[in-house]
């Protein structure tokens, strides 16, 4: 073992950098959690970063440790416990690709078996206090049902007692060397993972000893093994490869079987050094199988217990997973207790092993068994294979007047027995997914090979929605191994939008009222032009490098012309499908057949009417377009937030008792939200501009709400929901609880990005959309019957401006977790 540490321990500069990072609103932000030590009146601060901030060239973190505990001492802060610098799987980031490793790293390469449990950090204070931490916490916790740090400490004390070692002596040894012992606690009686650790294999597996410095420094594996032997830890096996070539051969051989020396393992951790600095460099090599299969069995079991459904959407291991369910379901049905324990994480491995025993094979044997592999092949979908069983969906990407419906009708007229056409404008109910449900219902018919899902789909979110519906609903209508190819047809080249606007406007004028929703005579020129301009303004052209457009199996990009463009479009679509999928279009119809089908499509008359906006004075007036009263982010983690409030006020007996009473009496709001904008607050210039931006963003949802409202008024008998969910999200953190005699509110922290705080379905900021309230907040409870929710603004602004009197209670909340709210329109 190395000599005792005699270097500098104070890390004032690191703490300053962490505190600066704590104030960031976006990338690289640090989060603190103050922890009470179990055997001392001292505290430590746990620091962490978002997982996705590690390993980024564009983000420099103050420290790359995953697991960092610093003494709560403003004068002489020291690192109490430290985990490894975050390391990545082979190929996961640029600096774990083999060519980078070859150029920048040097051996020997120490390869240790990756233990499969929960990580535990063990260190000591100068006075002999033993400190045991989980990844991000230590000490007593009331917010979890399993305390990993406490469980790890109990196991440590058992092993020290067995070696007749005093805990304080062990703690002082760690302090003297200024190190953290890093171990994996593996014990199925405490918590099951994927690999099995029965009683005879349970314990703390020591796999590293890190020096408590900001810069990563760790002991060699021979020194780690010495400490493990001396203090009763279980040792992790270490194999050394002197060259990278030897290492890759070793890993390839083990990967072929998913095991090492006949034992199932999750993978390896490889330790080497950087050529340029001789600093330690870690990376990992994880096996996909059989752990993917085991995890899959765990997920389908949980899903069955929760939903009583054995339908699953995993693409691999379909045959053997169905065999597993055949075995497991009768056992689950026979015992609610087994189900209850399974959802808590117990009995997972036992049920898996019972199945393997009944099947007569191990997991590795199943994967390597030729007969089962053949059955897997037979039962799996070959997504690259196209044959007579393959079905097709066509998604147009268009704006109004581009001829998608005429083109679609032409194609269906050519193949009336095998092609179908479902129009979004023919679907009048509130359930948008009826478009996909009706399309799949039609596609499920034996004779139907292709269905055109006719909607404009002019934005990414609409295309994404179609793919999500398809994934969610497919197996409700079709056999699970039906291969569906999705063809995109783009009708509107982005570089011709100006020309498209002029031509499509003339087409809409010419067709007059021959459309379900855009009726020229009723809506008038101004309204129709406004609707069409809105579509063009929001149009997002196809981008095959970006989700969801990269999910299309084939994209047909049409040109745009003046005369008979639908006829030309139909011919191009037929030609391109014939080339890509001759099974669908074996022969291209003759020109006169296509022209006949085209002329028939021109006779098409809509049979369903959809109402958009309002008519002019010469027609029967349609109701005024109703806009939202307010726009909010509805909070999805209600129970978690209530529990967090309870924890944070636990030290105040009076508040705790009052809050308990408010919960019991039902006075606490049943749904929580953050108001983003309100129609009554939009009278000032900036607020008015923001409100207009929100309404422009959600034009489609507002129009759809009004369509449904009119249908309900005409006697559908359904009560319309006054809340409309969008696909946008809001991330936030809780800051402080504000409580006076009238109301209880929570001040929240949103992104301070000047561009806005709302994110779309691609996790990108929506420019210009921010919170209208000066102090973003949640109204938690009204204490007086007549008080308006808007009073929360007054209370929160008082607190933020330090105008706090004796009637106002303020409690700082734990803001380590980022919550998510879905943006809703409230009518």
Swiss-Prot record:
Top EC class, one word: ligase
Location of the active site: 114 (n6-amp-lysine intermediate)
Q: Which UniProt keywords apply?
A: ATP-binding, Endonuclease, Hydrolase, Kinase, Ligase, Multifunctional enzyme, Nuclease, Nucleotide-binding, Transferase, tRNA processing
Q: Which GO terms describe its cellular component?
A: cytoplasm; nuclear inner membrane; nucleus
A GO term, aspect molecular function:
ATP binding
Checking SUPFAM superfamilies in the record gives: P-loop containing nucleoside triphosphate hydrolases
State the reactions this protein catalyses.
ATP + (ribonucleotide)n-3'-hydroxyl + 5'-phospho-(ribonucleotide)m = (ribonucleotide)n+m + AMP + diphosphate
| Enzyme Commission numbers on file | 6.5.1.3
One biological process term in Gene Ontology: regulation of nuclear-transcribed mRNA catabolic process, nonsense-mediated decay
Q: Where is the signal peptide?
A: none
Q: Anything else of interest in the record?
A: tRNA ligase is a relatively rare protein with about 400 copies per yeast cell.
Record family assignment: Belongs to the TRL1 family.
Q: What does this protein do?
A: One of the two proteins required for the splicing of precursor tRNA molecules containing introns. The ligation activity requires three enzymatic activities: phosphorylation of the 5' terminus of the 3' half-tRNA in the presence of ATP, opening of the 2'3'-cyclic phosphodiester bond of the 5' half-tRNA leaving a 2'-phosphomonoester and ligation of the two tRNA halves in an ATP-dependent reaction.
What's the entry's take on its domains?
A: Has three domains each corresponding to an enzymatic activity, namely in N- to C-terminal order: ligase, kinase and cyclic phosphodiesterase (CPDase).
Report the protein name in the record: tRNA ligase
This chain's source organism reads Saccharomyces cerevisiae (strain ATCC 204508 / S288c)
């Amino acid at each position: 073992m190395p000599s005792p540490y005699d270097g500098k321990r104070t890390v004032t500069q690191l703490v300053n950098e962490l505190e600066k990072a704590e104030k960031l609103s976006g990338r690289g932000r640090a989060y603190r959690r103050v922890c009470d030590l179990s055997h001392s009146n001292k505290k430590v601060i746990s620091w962490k970063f978002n997982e996705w901030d590690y390993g980024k060239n564009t983000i420099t973190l103050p420290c790359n440790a995953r697991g960092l505990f610093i003494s709560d001492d403003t004068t002489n802060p020291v690192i109490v416990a430290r985990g490894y610098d975050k390391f990545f799987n082979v190929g996961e980031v640029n600096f774990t690709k083999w060519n980078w490793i070859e150029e920048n790293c040097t051996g020997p390469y120490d390869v240790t078996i990756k233990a499969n449990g929960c990580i535990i950090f063990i260190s000591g204070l100068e006075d002999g206090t033993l400190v045991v931490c989980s990844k991000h916490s230590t000490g007593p916790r009331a917010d979890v049902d399993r305390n990993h740090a406490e469980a790890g400490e109990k196991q440590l004390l058992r092993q020290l007692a067995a070696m007749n070692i005093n805990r304080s002596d062990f703690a002082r040894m760690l302090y003297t060397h200024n190190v953290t012992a890093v171990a994996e606690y593996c014990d199925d009686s405490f918590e099951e993972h994927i690999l099995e650790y029965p009683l005879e294999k349970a314990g703390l597996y020591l796999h590293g000893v890190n020096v408590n410095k900001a810069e990563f420094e760790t002991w060699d594996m021979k020194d780690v093994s010495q400490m493990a032997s001396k203090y009763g830890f279980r040792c992790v096996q270490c194999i050394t490869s002197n060259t990278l070539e030897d290492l890759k051969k070793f890993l390839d051989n083990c990967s072929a079987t998913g095991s090492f020396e006949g034992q199932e393992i999750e993978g390896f951790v490889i330790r080497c050094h950087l050529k340029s600095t001789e600093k330690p460099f870690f990376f990992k090599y994880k096996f996909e199988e059989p752990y993917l299969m085991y995890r899959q069995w765990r997920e389908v079991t949980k899903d069955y217990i929760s939903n009583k459904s054995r339908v699953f959407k995993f693409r691999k291991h379909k045959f053997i997973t169905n065999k597993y369910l055949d075995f497991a379901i009768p056992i689950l049905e026979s015992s609610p207790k087994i189900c209850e324990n399974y959802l808590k994480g117990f009995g997972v491995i036992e049920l898996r092993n019972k199945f393997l025993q009944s099947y007569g094979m191990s997991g590795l044997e199943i994967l390597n068994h030729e007969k089962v592999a053949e059955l897997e092949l037979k039962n799996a979908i070959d997504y690259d294979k196209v044959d007579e069983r393959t079905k097709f969906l066509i998604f147009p990407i268009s704006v109004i007047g581009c001829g998608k419906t005429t083109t679609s009708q032409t194609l269906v007229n050519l193949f009336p027995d095998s092609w179908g056409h479902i129009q979004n404008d023919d679907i009048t109910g509130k359930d948008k997914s009826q478009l996909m449900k009706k399309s799949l219902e039609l596609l499920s018919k034996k004779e139907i090979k292709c269905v055109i899902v006719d909607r404009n789909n002019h934005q990414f979110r609409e295309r994404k929605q179609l793919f999500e519906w398809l994934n969610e609903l497919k197996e409700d209508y079709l056999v699970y191994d039906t291969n569906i190819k999705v063809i995109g047809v783009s009708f509107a080249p982005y570089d011709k939008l100006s020309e498209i606007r002029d031509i499509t406007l003339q087409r809409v004028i010419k067709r007059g009222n021959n459309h379900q929703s855009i009726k020229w005579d009723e809506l008038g020129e101004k309204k129709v032009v406004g609707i069409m301009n809105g579509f063009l303004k929001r149009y997002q052209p196809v981008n095959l490098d970006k989700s969801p457009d990269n999910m299309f199996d084939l994209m047909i990009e049409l040109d745009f012309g003046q005369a008979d463009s639908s006829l030309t479009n139909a011919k191009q679509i037929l030609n391109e499908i014939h080339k890509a999928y001759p099974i669908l279009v074996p022969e291209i119809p003759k020109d006169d057949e296509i022209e006949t089908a085209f002329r028939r499509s021109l006779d098409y008359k809509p049979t369903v009417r959809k109402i958009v906006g309002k008519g002019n004075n010469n027609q029967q007036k349609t109701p005024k377009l109703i806009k939202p009263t307010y726009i909010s982010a509805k909070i999805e983690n209600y129970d978690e937030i209530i529990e967090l409030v309870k924890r944070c006020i636990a030290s105040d007996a009076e508040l705790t008792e009052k809050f308990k009473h408010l919960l019991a009496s039902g006075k606490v709001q049943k749904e929580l939200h953050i108001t983003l904008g309100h129609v009554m607050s939009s009278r000032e210039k900036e607020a008015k501009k923001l409100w207009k931006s929100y309404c422009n963003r959600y034009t489609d949802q507002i129009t759809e709400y009004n369509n449904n409202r009119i249908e309900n008024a005409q006697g559908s008998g359904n009560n319309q929901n006054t809340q409309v969910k969008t696909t946008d999200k809001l991330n936030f953190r809780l800051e402080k609880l504000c409580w006076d005699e009238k109301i209880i509110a929570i001040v929240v922290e949103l992104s301070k990005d000047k561009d806005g705080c709302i994110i779309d379905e691609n996790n990108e900021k929506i420019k210009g959309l921010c919170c209208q309230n000066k102090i973003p907040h949640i109204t938690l409870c009204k204490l007086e019957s007549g008080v308006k929710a808007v009073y929360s603004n007054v209370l929160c602004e008082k607190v933020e401006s330090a105008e706090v009197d004796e009637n106002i209670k303020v409690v700082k909340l734990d803001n380590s977790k980022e919550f998510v709210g879905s943006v809703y329109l409230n009518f």
